[in-house]
């Protein structure tokens, strides 16, 4: 934050720090790694694959062309360094579903900088910065989910025994469903939550979808919590007004907490 405070806006800060060859944070990744790992290129390929959406050891191995044992060893080392962590789905039962980049700097670097280094090295960082801005809400939405969970659980009387992200099969369409927050208390009641970080208002379709997905896991619903960066449509507000299970949260509440 101290680095950002000296700039007039976020765009100029990102451009100067990341999107120029001499940017303070442009080469920081290699500075941090060079004293810690061998075969740096393999580590970078693994993190790039993860930033691109691969989150299972086998998928990462296939994407980067390394064997699973090598990738598994790299992931374990990155985990010990605090850069990645295992991801678990907590409902309907606890299970490991993959890995994700937990460190914010590395997540940003390998999502927006690493794949476009050639452009940045040719002083075309503005092109990359524009691409970054187009996708920044999606990135921030994922990074802010822990704050959403903390806010919801810190502002209810619900006392969960376990909580977190959930991925589970839909027995009707045979596809996987995802919910940002599922919390379960000792009495077997469920609390569900979704966080939408985008420039458009959240509509009733998001509320309906959350209620539908929740019904696949439990009929004992304590509450349905939806957070939106940009507020809610009149239809969504009206829907929540007539269903006391819904609790709507404006995104600025997360930034204040």
Region annotations inferred by a language model:
Residues 3-176:
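Accessory nucleic acid-recognition modules appended to NTPase machines
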Residues 156, 214, 240:
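Conserved hydrophobic residues forming the short capping helix/wall of the S-adenosyl-L-methionine
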Residues 177, 202-206, 236:
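Residues at alpha-helix caps and immediate loop-helix transition turns in enzyme cores, especially N-
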Residues 212-221:
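Arginine/glycine-rich "motif VI" loop of SF2 helicases in the C-terminal RecA-like domain
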Residues 225-257:
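Domain-level recognition of nuclease-like catalytic cores that cleave nucleotide substrates
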């Amino acid at each position: 934050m101290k680095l950002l405070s000296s700039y007039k806006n976020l765009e100029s800060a990102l451009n100067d720090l990341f999107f120029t060859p001499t940017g303070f944070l442009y080469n920081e990744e290699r500075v941090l790694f060079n004293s810690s790992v061998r075969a740096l290129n393999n580590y970078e390929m693994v993190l790039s694959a993860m930033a691109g959406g691969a989150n299972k050891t086998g998928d990462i191995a296939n994407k980067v062309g390394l064997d699973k044992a090598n990738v598994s060893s790299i992931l374990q080392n990155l985990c010990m360094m605090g850069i990645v962590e295992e991801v678990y789905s907590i409902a309907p039962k606890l299970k490991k579903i993959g890995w994700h980049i937990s460190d914010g700097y590395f997540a940003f670097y390998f999502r927006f900088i690493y794949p476009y280094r050639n452009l940045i090295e040719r002083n075309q960082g503005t092109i990359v910065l524009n691409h970054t801005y187009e996708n920044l809400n999606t990135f921030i939405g994922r990074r802010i989910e822990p704050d959403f969970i903390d806010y919801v659980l810190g502002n209810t009387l619900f006392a969960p025994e376990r909580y977190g992200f959930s991925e589970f099969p839909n027995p009707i369409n045979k596809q996987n469903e995802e919910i940002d927050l599922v919390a379960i208390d000792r009495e077997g009641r469920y609390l569900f939550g979704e966080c939408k970080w985008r420039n458009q208002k959240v509509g009733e379709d998001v509320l309906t979808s959350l209620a539908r997905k929740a019904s696949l896991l439990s009929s004992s619903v304590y509450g349905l919590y939806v957070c939106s960066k940009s507020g809610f449509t009149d239809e969504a507000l009206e829907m929540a007004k007539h269903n006391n299970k819904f609790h709507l949260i404006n995104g600025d509440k997360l930034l204040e907490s």
